[in-house]
A protein has these predicted regions:
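Walker B catalytic acidic pair
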Residues: 204
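Helix C-cap/helix->beta junction micro-motif
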Residues: 30, 140, 195-196
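Conserved core of the PLP fold type I
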Residues: 66-191, 207-222, 226, 230
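Conserved core segment of the aminotransferase class I/II
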Residues: 222-263
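N-terminal small-domain helix-loop-helix segment of the aminotransferase-like
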Residues: 2-104, 112
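Residue-level marker for buried hydrophobic side chains located in beta-strands
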Residues: 172, 200-201
Length: 263
């Protein structure tokens, strides 16, 4: 039996675990200090009462002969998919119900989606960014190219025509910098992806924090994005229940046709 050799290429520890240890050590040494936590994107308030009630109602329903229904639909309950449809429609973006896939969270989807793509693909990852993007691809053995960002470009990397990537990660607003792309900037990425037959994995976990009308809250607000992008979303941030585990991914029908063409 052979083990996956690429696991040896992972860093010895996870970034957020390191941060937690450093914070704990500092707090022990300085108990009088109030710490503003800028590590993992956790929440600081309890679950909203409406969320707790919905969980209670669902559990109570499953405890009755009439309400018990075992495994749910493999792609998510229609009532939730329809609610997500309405959420997008309220911002002017139309989705079909069968383009929405409910899951146990964005982090799982970000990893599981890679099963669709060959390990020979080259991955473009902004730096700094959510470390899971890198770890998921390191363990698969894909080549990773970093798009360096800094104050000089507002921590927003832009396409480089000299670089050929097959899978492009975009997180907007970005974790950890908070930088968010304008529609014009996202259009440049969409154009690059279509030109290079690339796929954009668009992490929209923090879209609910956008209030500036010049900034897109969904990649699908951009013309042509439905042909080259997958959008991953998390209820941990919009509904404030980190650890409860629920999210969804949007895969437009136009992308399905594009993937058939590429393959």
């Amino acid at each position: 039996m052979k083990m996956n050799k690429h696991y040896n290429e992972l860093k010895a520890s996870y970034l957020f675990v390191d941060i937690a240890h450093k914070v704990a050590a500092y707090q022990e040494a300085h108990p009088e200090k109030e710490i503003i936590r800028l590590g993992i994107g956790d929440v600081t308030q309890p679950l909203a009462k409406c969320v707790v009630k919905a969980m209670h109602d669902a559990a109570d329903e499953m405890g009755t002969k009439e309400g018990f229904h075992g495994y749910g639909p493999e792609q998510g309950y229609p009532f939730l998919k329809q609610a997500i449809q309405g959420y997008y429609a309220g911002r002017g973006t139309k989705l079909d119900e069968d383009e929405i896939f409910i899951s146990d969270g964005a982090k799982s989807d970000l990893a599981n989606l890679l099963g669709l793509f060959d390990v020979d693909n080259t991955v473009l990852v902004p730096d700094p960014v959510y470390p899971t993007y890198v770890d998921d691809n390191v363990t698969d053995g894909r080549k990773i190219i970093y798009s360096r960002t800094g104050q000089e470009n507002g921590f927003l990397g832009m396409p480089d025509e000299s670089v050929k990537a097959d899978i492009i990660y975009i997180c907007s607003p970005n974790n950890p910098t908070g930088a968010a792309y304008t529609r014009a900037q996202l259009k440049a990425w969409v154009d690059y992806a279509r030109k290079n037959d690339a796929i954009i994995l668009y992490d929209a976990a923090y879209e609910c924090f956008i209030s500036d009308g010049e900034l897109a809250r969904s990649i699908f607000e951009i013309e042509g994005a439905r042909e080259c992008a997958i959008e991953i979303c998390s209820f941990s941030k919009i509904a404030g229940f980190t650890g409860t585990r629920c999210g969804y991914t949007v895969v437009p029908k136009e992308l399905e046709l594009s993937l058939i063409h590429i393959s």
